[in-house]
Regions:
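N-terminal secretory signal peptides that target proteins for export/translocation
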Residues: 1-6
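Bacterial N-terminal signal peptides
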Residues: 10-22
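A periodicity- and composition-biased signal for non-globular, repetitive helical segments
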Residues: 11-13, 28, 322
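Signal peptide processing junction and immediate N-terminal pro/mature segment
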Residues: 20-33
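Sequence signature of WD/YWTD-type beta-propeller architectures
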Residues: 30-375
């Protein structure tokens, strides 16, 4: 399933250039030989300026980087990235420079530098972080060798599909913001990852396959008092607490394997509600910090003949009869690149996401000033 929170069940997308080429060829074939000299239809104006301003790339120097989150004061980001020196994602923090350019600051490695890592997040007090890591893998040397070989193969085939594996050696750790005082929080056999703090910092919601299927669990911030939140078939992951701490938003493919839908559930395990029900892949949901909106990534796969791009979508919601009720849906991005993993700054005025709208089509982090849709 998507790693995304970057967390993935299966292959989510091929490289952008290949997909664009395929869609172009389909269009030309449909035109037929008599349409060879026809002029292309005028391109519609982008919708992005309505919601996104001052778009800027804030990571560089990595083979790929993504899944970033803001610190509580909005001055630092934490994210995962692959350097040219190691085959797996590691966790980095990076200060944001003041002003419109935001960040070109030096990243700081805060994970161990070995193993696979993912799903980092700041504690609400800004003094600690959590992330998932497999650096305790007893066969780590062999795993690293396999990872290097895989990277070499991918370099020969730039159109490979990415697939997230549920590494059974993945555990959740906490640390100081500089990476010191590393502490293991989970000890179950199997995959433990996709973690986020509650607004008060007292609890952590995460995904685990300790019971068979990947489901959601909640534990105290020190790793104690673990309880299962969802009891569903398929994959259920990528959870985040709502700003008031009463709800958890997440993604699930319980209805159709590989077709993820956005769900919300009460922290008491009641009133599980699907906000989407379509033939697409909907994932990486995230709450707006001050207004009743949830943003996520979506691509429509209902028609296999049509290329579907991953874009960002925003839904307004309301609490009705003890449940989260879906409201108006607004598309936020329409760039030909892949746009995924959106998150808001603590004040809701900026949006950060992972995109391949780079010169070399690698995935990197972008930040933009954000405006909500007009009511």
């Amino acid at each position: 399933m998507p790693n995304i929170r970057a967390r993935f069940v299966a292959a989510l997308f091929a490289s952008l250039p290949l997909l664009c080429l395929r869609s172009t060829n389909l269009a030309r074939a449909a035109d037929g030989p008599n349409k060879a000299e026809a002029q292309p239809a005028p391109k519609a104006p982008s919708i992005e300026p309505r919601y996104l301003a001052n778009i800027r790339q804030v990571t560089s120097g990595f083979s790929k980087a993504g899944e970033g989150y803001f610190s509580p004061d909005g001055r630092t980001i934490i994210y995962q990235a692959i350097s040219d020196r190691y085959p797996f994602y590691q966790i980095y923090t990076q200060s944001l420079a003041p002003g419109k350019q935001d960040a070109k600051q030096e990243p700081k490695l805060v994970s161990t530098g070995r193993g696979k890592t993912t799903c980092s997040f700041f504690a609400p007090d800004g003094k600690s972080i959590i992330f998932a890591s497999s650096h305790l893998d007893p066969d780590l040397d062999r795993t690293e060798d396999a990872g290097r070989k895989k990277l070499a193969e991918e370099a020969k085939n730039p159109h490979h599909r990415y697939q997230w594996d549920f590494d059974p050696n993945m555990e959740i750790f906490s640390a100081a913001v500089d990476g010191s005082h590393l502490r293991r929080l989970t000890y179950s056999k199997g995959y433990d990852a996709e973690c986020a703090y509650s607004p008060d910092g007292r609890q952590i919601v995460f995904c685990s396959d300790r019971g068979g299927n990947p489901n959601l669990y909640i534990m105290d911030a020190d790793g104690g008092n673990v309880r299962q939140l969802t009891h569903e078939k398929g994959y259920n992951g990528g959870p985040f607490f709502s700003p008031d701490g009463r709800w958890v938003v997440y993604r699930s493919d319980r209805k159709h394997e590989g077709l993820l839908q956005i769900h919300v559930i009460g922290v008491d395990g009641r009133n599980d509600t699907a906000l989407t029900d379509n033939g697409g892949v909907n994932w990486a949901p995230y709450w707006h910090p001050t207004k009743p909106y949830i943003i996520w990534t979506s691509a429509d796969y209902s028609d296999p003949r049509v290329h579907s791009n991953f874009d960002l979508w925003l839904m307004k919601y309301e609490v009705r009869d003890g449940r989260i009720a879906a409201g108006k849906l607004t598309r936020i991005t329409d760039d030909p690149a892949t746009d995924i993993l959106p998150v808001f700054s603590p004040d809701g005025k900026r949006l950060m996401w992972t995109s391949t709208r780079t010169a070399d089509h690698t995935s990197q982090l972008f930040i933009a000033d954000f405006t909500l849709p007009q009511e």
